[in-house]
Amino acid sequence: MKVIAILFLLAFVLCTMEITMVEAGFGCPLFQFACDSHCRGMGRKGGYCGGNFKLTCICVVK
């Protein structure tokens, strides 16, 4: 029963946290605020630097 509850919780979290990849750059990895500003300018909730060596700007969907 605990396994089912954990799997359900994991599925719920993954469904509520949609992210989309954006082109590399946009301030990453040194200026994460530039990535966040870029994503907000596209109407997203925000953004952060991720991927290998934090070189990719990842935007969080609303």
UniProtKB/Swiss-Prot annotation:
Any single Gene Ontology cellular-component annotation: extracellular region
Disulfide bonds: C28-C49, C35-C57, C39-C59
Stored Pfam families: Defensin_2 (PF01097)
Tissue-specificity statement: Highly expressed in non-venom gland (hemolymph) and moderately expressed in venom gland.
Signal peptide stretch: 1-24
UniProt xrefs under InterPro entries: Defensin_invertebrate/fungal, Scorpion_toxin-like_sf
One example GO MF annotation: potassium channel regulator activity
Localisation per UniProt entry: Secreted
SUPFAM superfamilies: Scorpion toxin-like
Tagged with keyword Manganese: no
Keywords: Antibiotic, Antimicrobial, Calcium-activated potassium channel impairing toxin, Defensin, Disulfide bond, Immunity, Innate immunity, Ion channel impairing toxin, Potassium channel impairing toxin, Secreted, Signal, Toxin, Voltage-gated potassium channel impairing toxin
Main location: secreted
Family label: Belongs to the invertebrate defensin family. Type 2 subfamily.
Name listed for the protein in its UniProt record: Defensin BmKDfsin6
Organism of derivation: Olivierus martensii (Manchurian scorpion)
